Amino acid sequence: MIDLHAHILPNVDDGSNSLEDSLQMLLEAQEQGVTDIVLTPHHRRKFCKTKQELLAEFKSFCLEKEKRGLNVNLYLGQEIYIDSNYKSLVTSDKILTLCDSNYVLVEFDFVEEADITEVVYGLNKLGFKPIVAHFERYTYATIDMAKEVKSLGGLIQVNAQSLVGKGKFHFRKMTKALFKQNLVDFVASDMHLGRINCMKKAYAFVSKKYSKQTADNVFELNAKRFIKG
């Protein structure tokens, strides 16, 4: 499996506060059957490490991963919080796309309604492929909105915990509705320290309830569009 949304890089956001915690999270991912992870530290408010700082942290973490013999391929990106300045931000070379591709992982305010479709349209016009992170978690999200996101060239990611974890009922309901309408492009862990990695369980759930091909697509094959190496 390929996990394209994970906060495992240590000491850069709210995902992990130590190298040891991050290495343990990598081990757990490996045990879940994850072979490739895109590390996606936040770019929002107080979490605004520079591109150069993140690249340095990533290089160091990869070396530590090799020392521990962990067999997971690592890549770098960011989860970008969208505000009114998003166009100047994404074109400024200050943020990281996923695996140095034109795919960008974007998130919005969970409660205050954002114009997700307008942002998707704007990013697409700028030459980016926007992936809306954890679409099911936005309280104002609807199936019609998801359909419009897709029609405008956007992609939809949901969290594994929203399928099989102990998340809020709304998250589970929306995630299953998205699957029923064939609107999900990616399932990812959105791992933070303290969260249970349930990628294996979520894969089994999707494979059984929908189809193995659907599970293969959303847990691996679709992400191969931008994974390099």
Describe the function of each predicted region.
Residues 1-71:
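An N-terminally biased module of ancient metal coordination in phosphate/nucleic-acid-related enzymes
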Residues 7-9, 42-43, 77-83, 109-111, ...:
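Active-site beta-loop-alpha junctions enriched in small/polar residues
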Residues 30, 124, 179-180:
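Non-catalytic positions within long, well-ordered alpha-helices that form the structural scaffold/packing
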Residues 21-25, 57-64, 119, 145, ...:
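A general structural detector for well-ordered alpha-helical segments in enzyme core domains, enriched
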Residues 183-199:
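Short acidic/histidine-rich active-site segments
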Residues 203-229:
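Mid-to-C-terminal alpha-helical segments outside catalytic/metal-binding sites
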Residues 48-157:
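Extended substrate/RNA-proximal surfaces in nucleic-acid metabolism proteins
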